[in-house]
Amino acid sequence: MLYPIGIQDFESIRRNGYVYVDKTALIYRLATTGRYYFLSRPRRFGKSLLVSMMEAYFSGKKDLFEGLAVSGMEKDWTVYPVLRFDLSGEDYSRPDVLDAVLSRCLKKWEDLYGVPERSSTLSSRFKDVIEAAVAKTGRPAVVLIDEYDKPIVDTLWDENLSETVRVQLQGFYGVMKAMDGSIRFGFLTGVSKLGKLSVFSGLNNLKDISMDARYSDICGISEKELRKNFADSVKELAHANGLTEKECFAKLTEMYDGYHFCEKSEGVYNPFSLLNTLDSLHFRKYWVSTGTPSFLVKSLIQGNYRLAEMESLQVPESVLSGVYSRKPDVISLLYQTGYLTIVGYNPATERYTLGYPNKEVEDGFTDTLSEYFTPVRDNWSELSADKFVEDIRRGDVQMLMRRFTAFFADMDYRIQGKAELYFQNTMYVMLKLLGQQVAVERHTSNGRIDILVQTDRYVYIIELKRDRDPQDALDQIDEKGYDWPFLAGDRKVFKIGASFSSATRRLENWSVAE
């Protein structure tokens, strides 16, 4: 089987025999029930292939759709002039790049449709191209814009350039509304909606299908599609890894499934990781390894977020919809870029629960955070990690705390922010890296445990204090009864009070009680 890894051209996939998961029935529904749409999905989720397929459909290339669902639905196969803008391939952090990209696209169509004289502005040129396309073909135009937000994301940390880009795109996209009578269909995709309100203020007739249950699997691969299209591939993967087919499906689900884009939808697989796994016959972090955007980590750290909350975060729909015009909200960005997904919904409060979609994302994001929260010398990873794990498994709490002390003393302090949160986040990331069952701010009937680590033999209750005696932390554990839920079991409970210095950002002292 040929897997279209990195291939985003629909015609190439169909003509060269690559496997294609049929999404054409959904495109027919869009084309026959509305005119202007917006879709947000994470990177490498098949958005560009979707747009390419739309381009082929509206170009009337009937032969490419033979055997697909739409071949039995579409009767006319009308050829429309298609104007497709792909904004994904450039770095817009430099001035004038956006001008050059848009101008290059427009010039192609100006030559094709014979625009007699070029206007001075990009917006005017776009308008002239639409008019010329309609005049020459006698049919309304189709406008497809792939990765509308790439110029915005690339300039987030340059306020002046970001504002210039926003104003420019606002005027450019607004042409679609002004030329409504000359447009048959419009479709825009992107990773995020961080500029949706301000950039699209001139184009307020877009229907956002990002959280529409009818289109929840328009990108990505569902469980049903996996079993229908890749049954033999999964058998081969199972054999190569010494697994039964049932075990192999379960591991694929654990690693790459779990994306939900509305409150009532089946999970979908990350197509990039899934196809790479089936092709290479190895389970790896393919999607995460392509790079976590640095602006996400910067936003998370600067926002003083408690990292453990990323595993189960309660938010209103406005966060998922990205109703933030200029200043991006980091939780909204983490959801829209695929690092968090919907894992629950409470209709009474109308709040969504967000969490990591799968093991690949959770482990990979922890690895990325470790570069910021554990930036110590190489001897940490090479010499000490296994020893931390052994200390935890053996219940050697004194040695464990000595290692923590040495760890913080050896750190390169690049992280700023609230001291208590800094220590808590750092210990959380460390313990997650070590593969431990760790909870932060674990709720009890009388309060919240700062850090809770559990193994099959031991329970570690860690209370952190800044610039105070560690005995104060132990007293709080006793007064609040943090150990009560574990006293009836067979596991040994360690109560640890740890004191950090806000001046040196080191673990200064600790006390242990059993």
What are these regions (language model features)?
Residues 133-137, 430-456:
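Active-site metal-binding core of divalent-cation-utilizing nuclease and nuclease-like domains
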Residues 172-179, 332-340, 428-433, 476-496:
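Metal-dependent nuclease catalytic cores in nucleic-acid-processing enzymes
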Residues 1-419, 434:
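Phosphate-binding site recognition
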Residues 485, 489-514:
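Domain-level recognition of nuclease-like catalytic cores that cleave nucleotide substrates
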Residues 142, 458-460, 494:
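Structural motif
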Residues 163-167, 466-483:
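Mg2+/Mn2+-dependent nuclease catalytic core
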Residues 427, 449-466, 480:
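Conserved catalytic cores of phosphodiester-cleaving nucleases, focusing on short active-site segments
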